[in-house]
UniProtKB/Swiss-Prot annotation:
Keyword Calcium: no
UniProt source species: Neosartorya fischeri (strain ATCC 1020 / DSM 3700 / CBS 544.65 / FGSC A1164 / JCM 1740 / NRRL 181 / WB 181)
Membership in a protein family: Belongs to the deoxyhypusine hydroxylase family.
Catalytic activity of the protein: [eIF5A protein]-deoxyhypusine + AH2 + O2 = [eIF5A protein]-hypusine + A + H2O
HEAT-like PBS-type repeat copies, ranges: 71-97, 104-130, 200-233, 238-264, 271-298
GO cellular component terms, A-Z: cytoplasm; nucleus
Binding site residues for Fe cation 2: 240-241, 273-274
Matches recorded under HAMAP family: Deoxyhypusine_hydroxylase
Binding site for Fe cation 1: 73-74, 106-107
Protein name: Deoxyhypusine hydroxylase
Amino acid sequence: MSPSATDTTEGVDPTILTLRKVLTSESEPLARRFRALFSLKHLACLQPPTEKTLPAIQAIAAAFTSPSALLKHELAYCLGQTRNPESVPFLQQVAKDTEQDTMCRHEAAEALGALGYEDSLEILKALRDNQNESDVIRETCDIAVDRILWENSEARKAEKLKTSDFTSIDPAPPLPMTASEPSIPEIEKTLLDTSLPLFLRYRAMFALRDLASPPDLPTATRAVEALAKGLKDPSALFRHEIAFVFGQLCHPASIPSLTEALSNQSEAGMVRHEAAEALGSLGDCEGVEETLRKFLNDPEQVVRDSVIVALDMAEYEKNGEVEYALVPDAGVAAA
């Protein structure tokens, strides 16, 4: 994707230029490019925005020309976390671009939903209703439309949501709190009911996630076990989101089901890659690194790339590094 008309590097902070150069260079190791991306994401997500915010967003978007589907999908995810309207045009362009990888387009559409701006509804509805689009794109846009409508509704203001341990902007909010104690079997029933709208099922998914954190919460293991059943869902999109949630939770009880998903050669690449990255976040658990190394030469590129990044993340977990990021000089630490 070509940079936008407003994309200029003139007068940009040298740290951002260094990170942008690493991120957009095909000769840099993938793991190093991911670390550069997460450094830029930090600057792009600053609230309130600073003079570094827009150049960081533009630097992230500049890498959409990469041939790596894994990297591009992560770019889209990061832009969706910025809470910044400057990210919208880049994401809309990627979502509409049928030449782009499906996984990348899906993530761009999901990111538009996360940002919540109503001017994305027209594009998302058109993709949702286009019978020539893949199930992954149509399902993603269905959820994104519902999320934007919810975000801008009166009903949202009336809902009481449990405070989450996670700062991520999710594809759907958790189910609203009720007067009674949350019933995991009831939420699980909603999660697994394929007759319900995907947005509602995603709300159940994120409600279960919040009941599984922190890991020593009395409901945690039961919530993880309920979520694991979602890895058998007919929708690849749904299965990949379960794996993503497991990556957030870092709960050891998820390791068997993540290992099974990664090991299944007939599973969709977007699910296997998410399972690999989730295992990377559990890299300090016994046997996880050995499992990941088995797939370094997997036939599927996105799985191989994910394992490289996952092993780098596992190394970071073991070393107890403060942040999974690239620090080119002292300047970024103060940014």
